[in-house]
Structure formats: structure tokens, C-alpha cells
UniProtKB/Swiss-Prot annotation:
Assembly and binders: Component of the translation initiation factor 2B (eIF2B) complex which is a heterodecamer of two sets of five different subunits: alpha, beta, gamma, delta and epsilon. Subunits alpha, beta and delta comprise a regulatory subcomplex and subunits epsilon and gamma comprise a catalytic subcomplex. Within the complex, the hexameric regulatory complex resides at the center, with the two heterodimeric catalytic subcomplexes bound on opposite sides.
Gene behind this protein: GCD6
Spans annotated as Disordered: 1-20
Keywords from the named record: Cytoplasm, Initiation factor, Phosphoprotein, Protein biosynthesis, Translation regulation
Residues of the signal peptide: none
Family matches, as Pfam families: LbH_EIF2B (PF25084), NTP_transferase (PF00483), W2 (PF02020)
Localisation per UniProt entry: Cytoplasm, Cytosol
Organism: Saccharomyces cerevisiae (strain ATCC 204508 / S288c)
A biological process term (GO) from this entry: regulation of translational initiation
Protein name according to UniProt: Translation initiation factor eIF2B subunit epsilon
Family: Belongs to the eIF-2B gamma/epsilon subunits family.
């Protein structure tokens, strides 16, 4: 995480007004300015999502307005991508003035790759003094926060294990704003305590799913409800324990999928999370789909009293007209142009003769030509639109230029500073940026400076067909569709622990908390020698035993047999087929990992919890399958190999959790782990799976050295 030098103070706010207030009574807020997603690419390659305008107002302004009305005393803006832009914006905003309702501080955290990283950074900094609001920088809401805070305090008094309250709005009230991250919440009907959480597939996928709840979670619950009609607006009230829990569980990345699901299903933590349900308007701008819908809602005054003509920015001059039309001062409209319902136009914009605009937002200082049709679209500041163009359900970012007779079909995104030549017709869902995005699967379409790119004839022809002879732009091709992309998927594909361990700052406390076992003092022989396990030629491997052995272990787990029965069946099978314990270990590990994979795939448990559940119960089988140091080393090699073969999303977390379980249960000794690690395979295909284990082994070795020093 970023060190102290990454923290910049952006003004005193009302610091003097609250200087005498008890530190614990000061309501703090943490704003996540980065979503750690790619849904708003290619625009977010240039500007952070929180500074993108919605109805000509930067998204962050809506979040800060909410916090001001909520009575927050101190705000921390966590900035990852484009951190300097955000800091500069805040320093020049009203929130940095002496009469600001709160003190605001920007915290540079460029290494953060998910919400979990941010929470661990907060814990390291020690700046959270009590309960705090955790909110995304893309929230739009008119909720009465005092009621949510009252509910939070009430639950905290009634339940000493209460650590967090989620705000969930009812989607039936605002059906079009339903999230593209659907989820099921199982709630205690009488208290709204969250009993279980599960991500759901998108409705468009038509994938069938079911909710599988551990019956133990329903203990002491008289009646529960299953809700999949709730909008998760990512407004949470957290106690100071929340960052610490993220610190102790450094595999937690997502706020819901990892933290909420992990906490409420953990017997060890024993903490509770509650849901505050509201009928008020509370949504996140989490995708292009919700950007479109929320913009129309806002123009339609669904978020009253937060409306465009309230002019929340000091330089705004919007006035409200009938049919939800908003205009700033100094707008020039030709006599024959027609402005339809739900339309906003910024100051300095000129609209030509015969142009028709409906259900759209036009920014400031735009030049809209003659006989243009703009419907259900968004045109940001300083754009130029040539005559006779048609723009349908598209977005044009600031400083873009469209020539005459240009047609943008449904879903087009034109990036900052892009130029489209005359007479161009862009296909649906075309996304264009002004510069190449090499890491995003984009191809170059710039006819003014293409010398550094080696393009074939087809690409050159296609470039002309997209932006025209005088156009400037690069096609952006997302590897994941907007609807499929999510914070969870982004963390999996780009920024997970398994892919970016070198960017994850792990503390010794994080690793030590994962290893609950008290350290044992042992000495490691300096002359011990590791011998590779005897290789068995594939022609002599008994495939029939592996198949039968796996089935035997799976049957034992499915029917919850006791260990002695499972061992007896395996041993009988081993002797009847005349195979070695090496084959028995392979079959057992394969079956256990399949069980782990099943729990993860069905979303019954997270990766770490699934491994702990399976290996804590069935790992004792290995005590009767390995009898010396060499065989335990063989066991660890098999585990690593089979995890790679199984293609887990987080292979390093699976291996780490499995080894910790075996170590905690006294199945594998510490000195054996050291010898295995000193001689572990250097094959590149194992590099990813070993990334977490290296940290754990280092921690074990450091703890050994500290123990030796204490004895001396």
C-alpha cells in the first residue's frame, strides 16, 4: 500500500468547528474513487470514473453532497488510478474551502487493486477512529441517512457482534435501475440480519442457479426471507473492526463476495452484518446501462430534492422548464430547433436550425449543427457535431468532433478528442479512443500518424471505414462485454492475488493470523538431504485404481463416513490392486480438490473456506498414507500439481490454504515444509500457484529465528 507520503491533505474543511468533538464521535467516511473495473473503458483510460459527468456534474459531487447532508465530519478519498487528477479536482473545489462541511483528505493508493487492498491500507494507516461510512464515488441517492445511522446504532446495541450495516434499496420501486451484479440476500425477517449472500448469474445468461445454505446458519432464526430484488448501492456503515478483518484475511478482495459472505459464514469470526432496507432512491453508476438509466431518472426528478436545477456546483445556472427540460444561461437555440422532454443543455452551447434533441444531455460550449437528430444520447463539453448527423443512444466524450452526415448507431462510445470524418456510419456498440490502448485488445485507427504501427492492407482499409480519411481514433475492443465485466471478474482476470502478488502488501500479521497454530520450537538439520520421489512410469500407473480410489473418497465425503471407514475401504482397494501409497495419495488429493472445486463453483463457499472445510475434516487421511519425510514431500508435490491441473481461479490461495490446514492439524511438520520448499519444482507452470506460499514459508522461517533468539 502507499506509504504516508502518498497522503495529501486537501483543506481544513470545518475542522475548527469539530475540534472539541470526541474523536470516536466524529463520523468519518471512506470514498472509493476507483471501481477496479474496466466497464467504462475507453473513457476511464483518460479520466477516472468518479470525475466522469452525469447530467453535466462529475459523479463524485453527488457522493460528496450525500456525505455533507449525512453530517459527516471527515472524508477520506482513496485514489488509485488517475490519483493526481482527483487530488487536483478536490483542491480546486468547494470542498476544499474553509467553510466546507467536512475535512477532506485524498489518500494516494496506487498499488490498490481491489476493495480489500484499500481496507488493509486503511488499517495500516490507523486513521479510522470509530464507525465510518464506506461508499463508492459513483453513488446517487436521496436517502435520509439519519434513519440508516439510527438503525445501525440500534442493531449495535442489541448485538455486540454487529460490525457492519449495508444499505439496500428495493428494486421494485425503481425497476430500471436494477444492478448488473445481481445477488441474493438471505435475511432474518425480524432483524434484517444477513444470514447468507450469494452472487447470481445475469438474467441475460439464462443460467439456472440455486441457493445452497448451510443449515447451521439458520440456527436461532425463526423466519427468513430470500431477496433477489434489492439494489446494492454500496453504502455501508462499518465499525472499526472491518479494516482489521480485511487485514487478517488478506485473500478478501471484494466487499460482498469475499467479506460479507466470508464473515457471515465464519464460525471463527462470529460477527454479524445487517441490511438496512429503504424505498428511497439509492443507486450506483456501475455500467453504461445504469449510466443511461440513472441519467434519465435524474432528469425525471426521481432523486428529489437532489435535482439538476438545485445547481450543486457553484458555477451552474440551470433552470427547470416543463417536460423535464433544463437549460443553463447563455444557451443559443435556433428558431426551428426542437428540444424534447428530459433534456439538459449546458451554457455556451449553440444548436442549429432544424435540429431535434430528446432524452439527451448536452454539455457546455458544444456546437450542434443543423438538421441533426439526437436521441437518448450524451454529449459532453466542447464537442462539435456536423450538419445532418444522427446520434442514437450513444455517448460522445469531451472535445470530440463529428463531421457532417455522421451516424452513430445504438451503443457507440466516442472517446475524448476523437475525430470522425464526414459521411461515416458507425456500427452498433463501436467504441473509439483517441490513443491506442495496447493492453485492452485495441487496434489502431489513426490515419494522421500511423508510421509506428505495422498494419496490413485490411487494417488500413478498416481504419478508413471507421473514422474516415481525416479521422483520428482507435477502436477499443473489450475482451469482456460490459454486462459480463464486474469487480469480481476484474479482480480475477487482472488484479488478483494470484496475478499481482508482487503488488500486494502483506503484513506479518496477515500471514500469522492465517496460521492459528502456536509455533513449535524445532531445529532443522543442516545436513538433511532431500531425495526426489521415485518416478513411476506412466505405463505402470494403474488408471483403474485412480478411478476407483477417487470414487471411494468422494463416496466417503458424500455420505459423511468416519475416517476409519474411509481408510479401511481405501486400504482394501490398495491391496487388492497392488498399488503403492503414492497412488493412494494421488486419488485422495484429487477427490478432495474436486470437492473444494464443487463448493466454489456452486458458490456454497469461498475458495479459502472451501479448502479449510474439506482439508480440516479429511486431511487426517494423509496420516495413514504418508509415513516418512520423503512421502510427505511427495504429498505436497501432488497437491501443487493437482491444483494446477484443476485450473482453479485462485490456485495460489488454494495451495496456501491447503498447506496451512495440514500444518495446523499437525499432519505436516515444519522442517518437512522447509525441505520441500528448498527443492520445490522451478517449472514456470508452477510459478503462479506458489505465489502465496512463499510469503507463508518466509513467515514460518522468521518466526523460527525469533524463537531461537528468545531462547538464547
Amino acid at each position: 500500500m502507499a506509504g504516508k507520503k502518498g497522503q495529501k491533505k486537501s483543506g481544513l474543511g470545518n475542522h475548527g468547528k469539530n475540534s472539541d468533538m470526541d474523536v470516536e464521535d466524529r463520523l468519518q467516511a471512506v470514498v472509493l474513487t476507483d471501481s477496479y473495473e474496466t466497464r467504462f473503458m475507453p473513457l476511464t483510460a483518460v479520466k477516472p470514473r468518479c470525475l466522469l459527468p452525469l447530467a453535466n456534474v462529475p459523479l463524485i459531487e453527488y457522493t460528496l453532497e450525500f456525505l455533507a447532508k449525512a453530517g459527516v465530519h471527515e472524508v477520506f478519498l482513496i485514489c488509485s488510478s488517475h490519483a493526481n487528477q482527483i487530488n487536483d479536482y478536490i483542491e480546486n473545489s468547494k470542498w476544499n474551502l474553509p467553510w466546507s462541511p467536512f475535512k477532506i483528505t485524498t489518500i494516494m493508493s496506487p498499488e490498490a487493486r481491489c476493495t480489500g487492498d484499500v481496507m488493509r491500507d486503511l488499517d495500516n494507516r490507523g486513521i479510522i477512529t470509530g464507525d465510518f461510512i464506506l461508499v463508492s464515488g459513483d453513488v446517487l441517492t436521496n436517502i435520509d441517512f439519519s434513519k440508516m445511522l439510527e438503525f445501525h446504532k440500534k442493531m449495535h446495541l442489541q448485538d455486540k457482534d454487529h460490525i457492519s450495516t449495508m444499505c439496500l434499496s428495493k428494486a421494485s420501486t425503481y425497476p430500471k435501475t436494477r444492478t448488473i451484479e445481481p445477488a441474493a440476500f438471505v435475511l432474518d425477517k425480524s432483524t434484517s440480519r444477513c444470514i447468507y449472500y450469494q452472487d447470481l448469474p445475469l438474467p441475460s445468461s439464462r443460467e439456472k442457479t440455486s441457493i445452497q445454505i448451510d443449515p447451521e446458519l439458520l440456527d436461532n432464526v425463526d423466519e427468513f426471507v430470500i431477496r433477489n430484488d434489492l439494489i446494492d448501492c454500496r453504502i455501508d456503515i462499518c465499525t472499526s473492526h472491518v479494516p482489521l478483518i480485511f487485514q487478517e484475511n488478506f485473500d478478501y478482495q471484494s466487499l460482498r463476495t469475499d467479506f460479507v459472505k466470508g464473515v457471515i459464514s465464519s464460525d471463527i469470526l462470529g460477527k454479524h452484518i445487517y441490511a438496512y432496507l429503504t424505498d428511497e432512491y439509492a443507486v450506483r453508476v456501475e455500467s453504461w446501462q445504469t449510466y443511461d438509466t440513472i441519467s434519465q431518472d435524474f432528469l425525471g426528478r426521481w432523486c428529489y430534492p437532489l435535482v439538476l436545477d438545485s445547481n450543486i456546483q457553484d458555477d451552474q445556472t440551470y433552470s427547470y422548464e416543463s417536460r423535464h427540460i433544463y437549460k443553463e444561461k447563455d444557451v443559443v437555440l435556433a428558431q426551428s430547433c426542437k428540444i424534447g422532454k428530459c433534456t439538459a443543455i449546458g451554457s455556451g452551447t449553440k444548436i442549429g436550425e432544424g435540429t431535434k434533441i430528446e432524452n439527451s444531455v448536452i454539455g457546455r460550449n458544444c456546437q450542434i449543427g443543423e438538421n441533426i437528430r439526437i436521441k437518448n444520447s450524451f454529449i459532453w463539453d466542447d464537442c462539435i457535431i456536423g450538419n445532418n448527423s444522427i446520434i442514437d443512444h450513444s455517448l460522445i466524450a469531451s472535445n470530440a468532433t463529428l463531421g457532417s452526415n455522421v451516424r452513430l448507431n445504438d451503443g457507440c462510445i466516442i472517446g475524448f478528442n476523437v475525430k470522425i470524418d464526414d459521411n461515416m456510419d458507425l456500427d452498433r456498440n463501436t467504441k473509439i479512443s483517441a490513443s491506442p490502448l495496447k493492453n485492452a485488445g485495441s487496434r489502431m485507427y489513426d490515419n494522421e500518424s500511423n508510421e509506428q504501427f505495422d498494419q496490413d492492407l485490411d487494417d488500413q482499409t478498416l481504419a478508413v471505414s471507421i473514422v474516415g480519411d481525416k479521422g483520428v481514433g482507435y477502436i477499443y475492443e473489450s475482451e469482456v462485454s460490459d454486462d459480463e465485466d464486474s469487480s469480481t471478474e476484474a479482480c480475477k482476470e487482472i488484479n488478483t492475488l494470484s496475478n499481482q502478488l508482487d503488488e500486494l502488501y502483506l503484513s506479518d500479521d496477515s500471514i500469522s493470523s492465517a496460521t492459528k497454530k502456536t509455533k513449535k520450537r524445532r531445529t532443522m538439520s543442516v545436513n538433511s538431504i532431500y531425495t526426489d520421489r521415485e518416478e513411476i512410469d506412466s505405463e505402470f500407473e494403474d488408471e483403474d485404481f485412480e478411478k476407483e480410489g477417487i470414487a471411494t473418497v468422494e463416496r466417503a465425503m458424500e455420505n459423511n463416513h468416519d475416517l476409519d471407514t474411509a481408510l479401511l475401504e481405501l486400504n482394501t482397494l490398495r491391496m487388492s490392486m497392488n498399488v503403492t501409497y503414492h497412488e493412494v495419495r494421488i486419488a485422495t488429493i484429487t477427490a478432495l480438490l474436486r470437492r473444494v472445486y464443487h463448493f466454489i463453483a456452486t458458490q456454497t463457499l469461498g475458495p479459502k473456506d472451501a479448502v479449510v472445510k474439506v482439508f480440516n475434516q479429511w486431511g487426517l487421511l494423509f496420516k495413514r498414507q504418508a509415513f516418512d519425510e520423503e512421502e510427505y514431500i511427495d504429498l505436497m508435490n501432488i497437491i501443487m500439481e493437482k491444483i494446477v491441473e484443476q485450473s482453479f481461479d485462485k490456485p495460489d490461495l488454494i495451495l496456501f490454504s491447503a498447506l496451512v490446514s495440514l500444518y495446523d492439524n499437525d499432519i505436516i511438520e515444519e522442517d518437512v515444509i522447509y525441505k520441500w520448499w528448498d527443492n520445490v519444482s522451478t517449472d514456470p507452470r508452477y510459478d503462479e500457484v506458489k505465489k502465496l506460499t512463499v510469503k507463508w514459508v518466509e513467515w514460518l522461517q522468521n518466526a523460527d529465528e525469533e524463537s531461537s533468539s528468545e531462547e538464547e
